[in-house]
Amino acid sequence: SIRRQRQMCIRDSLQPADLSFPPQLRKVAIVNNTSNAPDDKLTPQTKKSKDNRVEISRAIAYANGDPKVATEAMAEEIAHQNYFDEVVICDSALRANDKISRESTLSQEEVRQLASDLGVDLIIALENLQFKITKTVRYLEEFGCYQGAIDAKVYPTVSVYLPERSKPMATIRLNDSIFWEDFGISPTEAAAQIIPTKDMLKEAAEFAGTVPVKYIVPIWKNGKRYLYTGGSVPMRDAAIYVRENSWDEAYGLWNQAYQSTKNEKKKMRAALNIAVYYEMKDSLAKAEKWATTAQQHARKTELKKNTDNNKINTDEAPNYFYISLYLTELKERNAQLSKLKLQMSRFNDDF
């Protein structure tokens, strides 16, 4: 049963980026290459819902994001990942003299001049930043109150430049969203409680600056894992070793528990714990092998023969469902390992 599990946080795991850079590219500049055009926030288009029982009002507006704030946030987040030796920021608009808003990439001459002036090996430029902002007021019947909410969808465009290339190495067009909410006893109060527009636009720009980072450099991702802690004395004793961070001792007891029983459910629990142990040791291939074993035992205990995976009821097969999700994640990490090693070769695989 899932009730026999205890939750734990493992150390962060490193996720590879979409882009890969040669190890010799160690200094980077983050620049603002957006056009210095007037902010073109539109008057919100407000609509009252016909169904006043749920949605009271909805307003949609469009705006240019603050590129200076976004550029600073992107530089800070990239520096925080400690991937490049040096991160330089140039948040002043390179196209400050533009009279008409336009999206224009840097020329090779501009890239060379910037790289020389800033003393860097490559340029990462914010090219454009657009927002779509939706503000709603709803009545939450189950709580007897009103919810004021803002959903800001951000659309950053970022290009990566190398001095020796005539065109960008890559251009990334992304979208993501950030959400705020507050509550009140009336629609007016709920709308008034929500974050002020000025603060919302600033936070949305900061968020937008962080969105491209995981596509550019490897990032650390925190993960949670579950361990089975009951069912036998060795399993309970192993849980104590885990609390003391004595993973090798815990592994010995889990292996003992697995080898000493023919019960499919007990084997499933021990095998899953062993998979987590090997993941903690960065032995992803062994972790995947043991998670596969745990999944096979779970299938025997919780599923009927020839059950279609697409028709699995999670309430009837909670262990099989969780272990399958975990196995999928391990397979993804394993498949990305060679790419991650390539990207981290600048650190001599010390990560």
Give the role of each language-model region.
Residues N32-A125, R165-A170, L303, N310-F351:
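N-terminal segment of the mature soluble domain
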Residues S13-N33:
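Post-signal peptide N-terminal segment of mature Sec-exported envelope proteins
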Residues D66-I78, F84-G230:
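Long, contiguous interaction/recruitment modules in multidomain scaffold/adaptor proteins
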Residues G231-F351:
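Alpha-helical protein-protein interaction scaffolds
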Residues P23, D117-D121, N245:
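Active-site charged/polar residues at nucleotide-handling catalytic sites that mediate phosphoryl
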Residues K27-A37, Y226-T229:
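Short hydrophobic beta-strand segments
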Residues S1-I10:
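Single conserved hydrophobic/aromatic residue that forms the stacking wall/gate
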